[in-house]
């Protein structure tokens, strides 16, 4: 079967955060093919999370050669499920902590190139640092660079 994309993206989070991020991303850049979400709800146990993560991964793998999973928190259930899945596969990379600036840059780069995951992630720290600003009424501000 011919792969249509190099990198599938899976957003995973506690609650609806991942769906909100996807909706906002689509407002900015348009349709995001090969991007799925897994929301963890209070009624789910660890096995439920693992099953949903694996099902989303398998859907992405039908079209994509690699899968990039973004999770909201390092020690959260979505991250634990993603890391467990990653440990059993060779084609998964997990990134913990994501925001809209990161998603816009990476999805745009993914959509306009044939990069592999490691190439796509080069410079992600700079994007993250430059997207953080602390501003005051007095005009003082901090940026991560």
Q: Where on the chain are the PLM-derived regions?
A:
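N-terminal loops that bind phosphate or other acidic moieties
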Residues: 2-145
């Amino acid at each position: 079967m011919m792969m249509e994309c190099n990198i599938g993206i899976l957003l995973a989070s506690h609650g609806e955060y991942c769906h909100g991020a996807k909706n906002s991303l689509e407002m900015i850049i348009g349709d995001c093919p090969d991007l799925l979400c897994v929301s963890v709800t209070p009624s789910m146990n660890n096995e439920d999370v693992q099953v949903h993560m694996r099902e989303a991964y398998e859907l992405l793998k039908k079209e994509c050669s690699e899968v990039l999973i973004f999770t909201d928190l390092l020690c959260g259930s979505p991250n634990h499920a993603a890391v467990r899945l990653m440990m059993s596969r060779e084609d998964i990379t997990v990134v913990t902590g994501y925001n809209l600036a990161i998603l816009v840059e990476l999805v745009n780069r993914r959509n306009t190139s044939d990069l592999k995951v490691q190439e796509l992630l080069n410079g992600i720290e700079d994007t993250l640092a430059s997207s953080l600003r602390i501003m005051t009424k007095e005009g003082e501000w901090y940026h991560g660079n």
